[in-house]
Amino acid sequence: MAPQLAGSSHSSSASDQAHRQSSDPALESGSDTHVGSIAPKTETDFLVSFTGDDDPRSPKHMSSARKWLIVAIVSSTRLGLSPMILAPLSEFYGRKPVYVVSMFFFVVWIIPCAVARNIETLIVARFFNGFAGAAFLSVAGGTVGDLFPKNKLQAPMMVYTASPFLGPELGPVIGNFINSYLDWRWSFYILLIWAFAQWVSISLLVPETYHPVLLRREAQRLRKETGDDRYYAPIEKMDRSIAQTIIRSCYRPFLLLTLEPMCLLLCLFCSVLLGVLYLFFGAFSLVFKDNHGFNLWQVGLSFLGITVGMIIGISTNPFWHRNFMRLLQNHEAKTGTVGSSEPEFRLPPAVGGAPLVTIGLLWFAWTTYPSVHWIVPIIGSGIFGAGVIMIFSGVFTFLVDAYPLYAASALAANSFSRSMFAAAFPLFGQAMFRNLGYQWAGFLLAMITLLLAPFPYIFYRWGAKIRQHSRYAGAK
């Protein structure tokens, strides 16, 4: 948020009116000459800013219902390179233009997917379709931060975190039903209808929330109404170009992955988990078709186990929020500074979720026998799903707090690495399950997550010391 406007806040409508209706000729003419002991105005007096979270112009002042509606829309609309290019544009033009334009092209590129006559057309169309839709992976997190103060961020961030996982799990349920009774092209036709509805919702219901852009609009309004060109917003003083910002956005995530062990290892953990999630698209088809004779739509329903597990993981948020507030209060009592916090306080959900993903994968792996009832491996996948959502919630909020100046780059690094793993794992998933056997393939995945599971706790316990030696993270 920009610095608070000095004095009586010339950005308020009351002071604007007083300024315009003043009977002092010097004031009416825009002169800095004042009578009595009033000091001449400085440039800071014309800085347009919010007076706090309770400022009616601030997105944080919106009603809770409106905030959650915006979160629901931008979270349900949602791979690697696009966020690095599209996200910086929101720093210049705001969130909404990026949403509206990106979603429009997302809708447009679904059409050639639906009418494609060869695989080449489908691949090219899907590439541009994903490129357009990926803007929400990075920009939507910023919208959530625009709407909620820091101490109330965990619940909406949990919903935002869950959205890119609930989609892939509900997709096979809906898609397999469609493909069982209709032509495969109807999967894209229905997606086209849904995406168009989302685009309309974004265009009509989601306002601009990016604070610097809102303040720029306010400064423009004040200049127009008062005729005084000295009013300005901080964003209007930026000396960097769009090209410079995009270039920086493209290379800084790789610097974080290369030079920051915390960012690298947590992004690696998230990437493996998303890769396993996408690998299940092929593995579930093998396990439940071969072992239990499921047809296409029944295989789709088997993904509901992961969905239910994720919903259970989301429902644990009140517990983690209370834990965060307890850590915050203890830290305030220790330091004597009200509102002081540490990024590591965001990691307990990831610490709790790490053993769940390993347990869930082991459960799934060693219950994939024809003699074991089909519900048992599905329960294991649900445990895995609960752990995944808890880990991502903790890691996302930690990255934002640990790299305050480079939060967008940290999330872009996470998005890029996750997208690469999600694209690669399905390519070898079915071959691995066939060659190693269902049990040993699942066991291998569990052991990989076991190797990565200690890192959330390590960074929770010693992260502050590690940050002291970091060039990007905020040191303690």
UniProtKB/Swiss-Prot annotation:
Residue numbers spanned by region Disordered: 1-38
Entries under SUPFAM superfamilies matching the protein: MFS general substrate transporter
Predominant subcellular localization, coarse grouping: membrane
Instruction: List residues traversing the bilayer.
Output: 69-89, 96-116, 127-147, 186-206, 264-284, 294-314, 347-367, 372-392, 403-425, 440-460
What protein family is recorded?
Belongs to the major facilitator superfamily.
The protein's role, per its UniProt record: Efflux pump that might be required for efficient secretion of terreic acid.
Instruction: Report what the protein is called.
Output: Efflux pump atB
Q: What is the lineage of its organism?
A: Eukaryota, Fungi, Dikarya, Ascomycota, Pezizomycotina
This protein's gene is called atB
